[in-house]
Curated annotation (Swiss-Prot):
EC identifiers of the protein: 7.5.2.11
Alphabetized Pfam families for the sequence: ABC_tran
Top-rank taxon, per record: Bacteria
Alphabetical UniProt keywords: ATP-binding, Cell inner membrane, Cell membrane, Membrane, Nucleotide-binding, Repeat, Sugar transport, Translocase, Transport
Protein name in UniProt: Galactose/methyl galactoside import ATP-binding protein MglA
Gene assigned in the entry: mglA
Known function: Part of the ABC transporter complex MglABC involved in galactose/methyl galactoside import. Responsible for energy coupling to the transport system.
First and last residue of the signal peptide: none
Gene3D superfamilies assigned: P-loop containing nucleotide triphosphate hydrolases (3.40.50.300)
Species of origin: Fusobacterium nucleatum subsp. nucleatum (strain ATCC 25586 / DSM 15643 / BCRC 10681 / CIP 101130 / JCM 8532 / KCTC 2640 / LMG 13131 / VPI 4355)
Amino acid sequence: MENLKYVLEMENISKEFPGVKALDDVQLKLKPGTVHALMGENGAGKSTLMKCLFGIYEKNSGKILLDGVEVNFKSTKEALENGVSMVHQELNQVLQRNVLDNIWLGRYPMKGFFVDEKKMYNDTINIFKDLDIKVDPRKKVADLPIAERQMIEIAKAVSYKSKVIVMDEPTSSLTEKEVDHLFRIIKKLKESGVGIIYISHKMEEIKMISDEITILRDGKWISTNDVSKISTEQIISMMVGRDLTERFPKKDNKAKEMILEVKNLTALNQPSIQDVSFELYKGEILGIAGLVGSKRTEIVETIFGMRPKKHGEIILNGKTVKNKSPEDAIKNGFALVTEERRSTGIFSMLDVAFNSVISNLDRYKNKFRLLKNKDIEKDTKWIVDSMRVKTPSYSTKIGSLSGGNQQKVIIGRWLLTEPEVLMLDEPTRGIDVLAKYEIYQLMIDLAKKDKGIIMISSEMPELLGVTDRILVMSNGRVAGIVKTSETNQEEIMELSAKYL
């Protein structure tokens, strides 16, 4: 590997904004046919570095070399035309057009004055065959699942004959099977000599797929290493600038009396959950595990009144409650932090203050239905202080905050409703290591205040590190409930497959 030249070299890159040095002498060198992980907390400079590569930001100093030749792209289009492409976490596609249009838009192969439909189709099929993508190129993109839409973006990058492909959190919305398929595609790209920059917060993935890793912190280059020669603990320590002796906080919450009992809960619209029963105790963190498609999310959405139930009982503090809508659920003492933070959790173009109080806006209106700004500011301050939200001001657009800080605002917003049961669906998806640790600590602190916490997670280490008990779902049914201290990954995986 050492004898290979670099396909991409970013040397001594610096970028300043008014009052902020976002990048300070950063370097990244990518070898052809390798996967190079780029890691760092949110705000470490990963996005800014990639924006300098793609010409979205103009760097203040430093050099970018592609195949040994200095380049200064002025736009993403210019980068693409020179073989540098990116598969974004938030897919940028024309949903109402078909797959062919999304790959070739703006550069259709022509035959005289007309688009050469046959060549376009055949070229697409050839790329799909090479990458083992089984998608009908004439299908509308809106009708495809997220995994297939992502494969199309990779195929588009290949159609540009890309030498360098940047993948930003590519597995954040994929099932295990889809992740395996993505990794097979990455292997094929490596074999064809493509260099891949892989941005992810998932340690297990990084260790599995990457050859080298570069770590940034506070806009500075910290380290570049062979992945095989660096431990997870060393990576975390370099990212956060101090030793996190444990990936998870000390658990000092204690389960007390029962707060919630769910009996034979069955959703109206099937296939969904069937006869789900469990108990939740004050001071307890109950994890919900299961494969994607096992109907974990459907449990909390049915409890929260987002889905109608066919039958079953929800008993809170000994009294049966009827949550026919989220409004009912909130009044009855439930809160739900949804899985899709960007689409259902935040209003990204609105400020932190508005996003802090939106769950209970009527509470902030006076008798003339005008907003009481002092009350909004007071509660926003409480959220920012108690959740340790990093934001320049309350009027900052929430979309400009890191994923971890957005998530803290959402959790804080729900705490203002004073829930007794807090349900969190994939609460740490797409956020960095330190922000994850802070959210784990927050959950433990809330449990210590006698809240009942339910957490759905696809990350096994997280479930084993934070919860007291784990309910395992399999095909809409409860396969088992186990004490976290007495179980392991193998038992949970076996239970997950029980009713398949």
